[in-house]
Amino acid sequence: MQESSRSLSSTCELVTELLQELREPAGILRCEAEALLAGIVLDTKSFTIRTGERTFDAAARLRRTGADTAEVKKLLQTDMEDAIAKYKIMQSAQLYRKVAVAAPQEVQTRVVAAQAADELLNISGVEASIVVARDGKGRTFASARSIGELNVQLIMERLGGGGNRSAAAAQFDDCDVKEAVKRVYAAIDEYFAE
């Protein structure tokens, strides 16, 4: 295995490389190969971000081991209720400085909010997205995603959160969604002022 793991797209890519070192490819079960490939597909957003030569090598290795891409797709499917919730979140989005900011009125799970943030990146003209919502425990949070030059980690850090360049989050312990959205817009403005 190569020394540097900084260039890896995901933990699943690292595990795939480790498994190659530890045992024969035939020793990996099909379901294990599919789970690892699903992780790589998810973390790279279908091979569009943080993807390098090693990513494709790992995916090809898993495919040769027996991973079925149709089964991988099934592993990543969303149930109908979550899909509807995701699209309701997207309907609430407004474009501000190439950032889609969504603030649904309904209580949301963090998973669905993150999926909606991912989905908003498929819209032309959107370089980043931030979903601000309230979870089932009454906590206000933000889930941010980016595919371009815009670094959502820096925006979320201004709000007390963190993450990485393409995926970040923050939690607001002291305000409702409306106030959190105001803070998000201010953080976006500060980001662009630098």
List each language-model region with its residue ranges.
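Short alpha-helices
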Residues: 1-59
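Hydrophobic helix-and-loop "lid/oligomerization" segment in the mid-to-C-terminal part
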Residues: 42-194
